[in-house]
Amino acid sequence: MKDWLDEIHWNADGLVPAIAQDHKTGRILMMAWMNRESLALTVRENRAIYWSRSRGKLWRKGEESGHLQKVHEVRLDCDADVIVLQVEQLGGIACHTGRESCFYRVFEDGAWKVVEPILKDPDAIYHAGHRHE
């Protein structure tokens, strides 16, 4: 029997993009990367665990900020190369900038315009020197 993780088309680095989506509203909250271990742990623990490429280690979303993502459903796209996590974003903040979503800029009139407010000052969320969860 084929392992469910083997059905995923991992990139050359053994990663797959993962989109976190609010399970009630459908709003896209963020995009991060997952490897086999992080996806297996996410399914086992029902909380989002990603792979941090910059730190080269597992990234348990919310372990520094308290803004955990409780996973309600895991979906795989038709090409088996993108994951969607339907999550409950605890604390209402997914972005390390203190916003609800990492997608807070809109392209208008030839420039990127910030359209989402900062809900909480990142300095009040993170320990010194640890901004990008």
UniProtKB/Swiss-Prot annotation:
The entry's keywords: Amino-acid biosynthesis, Cytoplasm, Histidine biosynthesis, Hydrolase, Magnesium, Metal-binding, Zinc
Cofactors named for this entry: Mg(2+); Zn(2+)
Segments traversing the membrane: none
Entry's Gene Ontology molecular function annotations: magnesium ion binding; phosphoribosyl-AMP cyclohydrolase activity; zinc ion binding
Any one of the GO CC terms: cytoplasm
Compartments reported by the entry: Cytoplasm
Pathway(s) this gene product operates in, as recorded in its UniProt entry: Amino-acid biosynthesis; L-histidine biosynthesis; L-histidine from 5-phospho-alpha-D-ribose 1-diphosphate: step 3/9
Principal place of residence: cytoplasm
InterPro entries, sorted: PRA-CH, PRib_AMP_CycHydrolase_dom, PRib_AMP_CycHydrolase_sf
Enzyme class name: hydrolase
The reaction(s) this protein catalyses: 1-(5-phospho-beta-D-ribosyl)-5'-AMP + H2O = 1-(5-phospho-beta-D-ribosyl)-5-[(5-phospho-beta-D-ribosylamino)methylideneamino]imidazole-4-carboxamide
Highest taxon, organism lineage: Bacteria
Positions contributing to Mg(2+) binding: 77, 79, 81
HAMAP family given in the database record: HisI
Assembly and oligomerization: Homodimer.
Protein name: Phosphoribosyl-AMP cyclohydrolase
